[in-house]
């Protein structure tokens, strides 16, 4: 069941200008623990995250990173706008698998699919990272780095995966977009969690387990967001699949010490969900 707090609200007017409600500034957030996890967490508390989310939303600087892949949606809905506004958009397959959707460009969150699995909200394109792409797809030029397609710098390693493998909290103190190979060695980050920008190498990385009979997804070569900078989890209130994925994402983040607010959109309005 879904619950709205009713206090944190944003609306988009007919001219696509994004505004804040006066209630947001005065909204208070409980400091009680949720699911055994306190709001005072690594990377800022829930109230701070909400405040930053509102500020970024107002300036049109929010990015959404999808965890599902709907080529038709991105080809028909987002690609033309991104192409016109950013000068990118030449490869819809790549965009659909590694999506940065700027709230200020879209004017709204468009989600026509009932099987949407969820979105993570961040304040910077580079923090969206990318989680999946198929190097075997003809549309993806071999040997080119993602930075040639997208704005911003990309994380050099999968921060959450590396932390789960090492339990080294120092991992969270580095900038994953600027860390050197030597620093990653010192942090003990395993090779399998380091970014692979060369598409041919990604295929090599997946070849051995495939030959052994394992079904390997391209996510074996994933690059993830920096969780301390993620501001929230988008929930499609009309999609049970989205709600289920949102709970899964929140629980996974809580286990690592990050408690993220659920954010839903209805009729051009954004609201925090107390629970899903």
Swiss-Prot record:
<keyword id="KW-0843">Virulence</keyword>
<comment type="subunit">
    <text>Interacts directly with host ubiquitin.</text>
</comment>
<dbReference type="GO" id="GO:0016757">
    <property type="term" value="F:glycosyltransferase activity"/>
</dbReference>
<dbReference type="GO" id="GO:0005576">
    <property type="term" value="C:extracellular region"/>
</dbReference>
<keyword id="KW-0328">Glycosyltransferase</keyword>
<dbReference type="GO" id="GO:0043657">
    <property type="term" value="C:host cell"/>
</dbReference>
<keyword id="KW-0964">Secreted</keyword>
<protein>
    <recommendedName>
        <fullName>NAD(+)--protein-threonine ADP-ribosyltransferase</fullName>
        <ecNumber>2.4.2.-</ecNumber>
    </recommendedName>
</protein>
<comment type="function">
    <text>ADP-ribosyltransferase that specifically modifies host ubiquitin on 'Thr-66' residue, which causes the shutdown of polyubiquitin synthesis and disrupts the recognition and reversal of polyubiquitin in host cells during infection. Threonine ADP-ribosylation of ubiquitin prevents the transfer of ubiquitin from ubiquitin-activating enzyme E1 to ubiquitin-conjugating enzyme E2, which inhibits subsequent ubiquitin activation and leads to the shutdown of polyubiquitin synthesis in host cells.</text>
</comment>
<keyword id="KW-0808">Transferase</keyword>
């Amino acid at each position: 069941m879904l619950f709205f707090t009713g206090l944190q609200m944003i609306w988009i007017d007919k001219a696509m200008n994004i505004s804040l409600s006066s209630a947001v500034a005065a909204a208070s957030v409980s400091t009680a623990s949720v699911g055994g996890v306190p709001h005072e967490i690594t990377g800022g508390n829930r109230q701070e995250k909400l405040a930053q989310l509102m500020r970024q939303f107002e300036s049109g600087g929010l990015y959404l990173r999808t965890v599902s892949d709907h080529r038709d949606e991105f080809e028909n809905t987002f690609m033309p706008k991104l192409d016109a506004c950013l000068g990118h958009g030449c490869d819809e397959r790549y965009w659909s698998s590694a999506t940065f959707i700027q709230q200020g460009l879209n004017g709204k969150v468009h989600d026509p699919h009932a099987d949407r699995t969820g979105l993570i909200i961040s304040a910077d394109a580079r923090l969206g990272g990318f989680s999946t792409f198929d190097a075997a797809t003809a549309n993806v030029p071999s040997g080119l780095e993602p930075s040639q397609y997208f704005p911003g710098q990309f994380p050099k390693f999968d921060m959450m995966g590396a932390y789960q493998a090492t339990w080294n909290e120092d991992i969270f103190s580095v900038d994953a977009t600027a860390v050197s190979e030597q620093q990653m060695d010192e942090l003990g980050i395993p090779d399998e969690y380091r970014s692979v920008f060369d598409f041919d190498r990604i295929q090599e990385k997946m070849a051995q387990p495939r030959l052994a009979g394992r079904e390997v997804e391209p996510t074996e070569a994933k690059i993830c967001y920096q969780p301390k900078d993620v501001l929230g989890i988008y929930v499609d209130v009309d999609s049970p699949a989205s709600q289920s994925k949102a709970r899964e994402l929140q629980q996974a983040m809580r286990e690592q010490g990050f408690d993220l607010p659920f954010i839903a959109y209805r009729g051009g309005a954004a609201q925090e969900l107390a629970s899903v």
